[in-house]
A protein has these predicted regions:
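Short, well-ordered turn and helix-capping elements at secondary-structure junctions
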Residues: 28, 32, 60-62, 77-79
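Amphipathic alpha-helical dimerization/coiled-coil segments
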Residues: 78-108
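Beta-hairpin "wing" of winged helix-turn-helix
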Residues: 51-68, 74
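Residue-level signal for threonine
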Residues: 4, 75-76
Length: 108
């Protein structure tokens, strides 16, 4: 089943490093060039579901000087596999769309 837009962005934000909630929101905005904004309610509702499903794990604060109330999240092994599967699915969708509407990939 396809991932929701919010879930996909959260997993992409966690793919490169562990992040706290605000860090996830900033990374989502950066990766999408500001086109997708993830609010706190959407973020934390989704994070709780991802934690419950074993897709994301909580970890201890990054360093001793870090605010102990700050919670850091990371992709689980299962979450990394799920993200890879979703990326492959989306690549297939784009490939199929290009065949049907005859769009050529842009060249840099």
């Amino acid at each position: 089943m396809p991932l929701s837009t919010a879930t996909l962005h959260i997993l992409l934000a966690l793919a490169s490093e562990d992040r706290h909630g605000y860090g996830i929101m900033r990374e989502v905005a950066r990766q999408s060039d500001g086109r997708y904004k993830l609010g706190p309610g959407t973020l934390y509702d989704n994070l709780q579901k991802l934690l419950d499903q074993g897709i994301v794990e909580e970890r201890s604060p990054r360093s001793l000087g870090d605010d102990p109330r700050r919670r850091y999240y990371r992709l689980s092994r299962f979450g990394r596999g799920l993200l890879a599967t979703e990326i492959a699915r989306l690549e297939g969708v784009v490939r199929e769309a290009r065949l049907h509407i005859k769009i050529r990939p842009e060249r840099a």
